[in-house]
Amino acid sequence: MQLGDMSAMLKQVQQMSEKMQEAQKQLESMTAIGESGGGLVKAMANGKHEIISIQIDKDVLDDVDMLQDLIVAAVNQALTEATKMAQEEMSKVTGGMMGDMNFLKNLNMGG
């Protein structure tokens, strides 16, 4: 590989790194919502897989066991949606170069 080729490749890597950092910042402001019990419990996550809010309808406050199950289901759905959102956003940056890697599922976007 010639020096010019190596320089061009390094420049491309740097540009991709900058684009990925920008995409990660965008993910912080994106939200995904999960709900359970027909909307009785709603959880909101950002693109960094952080739960940022939980809303609970007062009608389920009397049944703690059901409430716990509904919270878990809503949070899991919100995190699944956040993962899909992150994968789509990063795919835009990489142009599909990374294929169908599932590394984002376990990626701690928080640093």
UniProtKB/Swiss-Prot annotation:
Keywords, A to Z?
Answer: Cytoplasm, DNA-binding
GO cellular component terms, semicolon-separated: bacterial nucleoid; cytosol
Q: Where in the cell is it found?
A: Cytoplasm, Nucleoid
Lineage: superkingdom: Bacteria
Instruction: Cite the GO molecular-function annotations of the record.
Output: DNA binding
- Function field: Binds to DNA and alters its conformation. May be involved in regulation of gene expression, nucleoid organization and DNA protection.
Per the record, the similarity remark reads: Belongs to the YbaB/EbfC family.
Query: Subunit structure of this entry?
Result: Homodimer.
Q: What is this protein called?
A: Nucleoid-associated protein Ctha_1157
Q: Which organism is it from?
A: Chloroherpeton thalassium (strain ATCC 35110 / GB-78)
Q: What lineage, starting at the top, does this entry show?
A: Bacteria, Pseudomonadati, Chlorobiota, Chlorobiia, Chlorobiales
